[in-house]
Amino acid sequence: MNRSLYRTRIKFCGMTRAGDIRLAGELGVDAVGFIFAHGSPRRVAPAEARAMRQATAPMVDVVALFRNNSKEEVREVVRTVRPTLLQFHGEEEDAFCRSFNLPYLKAVPMGSTGVNGEDANARTLQLSYPNTAGFLFDSHAPGAGGGTGKTFDWSRLPTGLHRPFLLAGGINAGNVFDAIVATLPWGVDVSSGVELAPGIKDGHKMRKFVEEVRRADCHEMS
């Protein structure tokens, strides 16, 4: 990949405040995420997300995150929030994920038990999710939620993927430079790494995170 023509995309997830969304836009973040997964401390109601969506800057994607939600719940979010991208963290199959007529990302759990007890395999992932827009590799274990603040062994990322991938799990301003240099992801997804508390973002951490991503991009161009 020619890194001179490339920049790492940035997604801030777990948004719960309009002010944080506005700052994300000012910082040039590519996407903001709302969480609708049951049990998440960052979960918001569709009506809340719809109101906060008004703070989104032009050309910033709005991502809706689910984990084993019902089809009716996903449809309500699609209708109410009008996201541009869906993200699934549960046991959802490809047919379910693509049934909402929106592009989607499939999260792959890379916690201590890996994917069904084994490391992720590019061929298996792509055969299982042929219609995904990309994969997101996170540090949580299968069946668990993200936002743990823990990293995973980046050397376990599968090789040979023909889809873009995002790196998540324990990323913050202190390690995102090394993460990008080591894995060359299409994008990085951060939640707890730019927070004061679950769902409450910190402006200084947000700004520093973006600066470190851009520093990594410049490093790869040199």
Curated annotation (Swiss-Prot):
Q: Which CDD domains match?
A: PRAI
Q: Which UniProt keywords apply?
A: Amino-acid biosynthesis, Aromatic amino acid biosynthesis, Isomerase, Tryptophan biosynthesis
**Enzyme class (EC, first level):** isomerase
Q: Extract one GO BP annotation from the record.
A: L-tryptophan biosynthetic process
Q: Report which superkingdom the organism of origin falls in.
A: Bacteria
EC?
A: 5.3.1.24
Q: Which reaction does it catalyse?
A: N-(5-phospho-beta-D-ribosyl)anthranilate = 1-(2-carboxyphenylamino)-1-deoxy-D-ribulose 5-phosphate
Named in its record, the pathway it takes part in is: Amino-acid biosynthesis; L-tryptophan biosynthesis; L-tryptophan from chorismate: step 3/5
Instruction: Enumerate the GO terms in the molecular function aspect.
Output: phosphoribosylanthranilate isomerase activity
What HAMAP family does the record point to? PRAI
Give the protein family: Belongs to the TrpF family.
Give the matching NCBIfam families. PRK01222.1-2, PRK01222.1-4
The name this protein carries in UniProt is N-(5'-phosphoribosyl)anthranilate isomerase
Q: What is the lineage of its organism?
A: Bacteria, Pseudomonadati, Pseudomonadota, Gammaproteobacteria, Lysobacterales
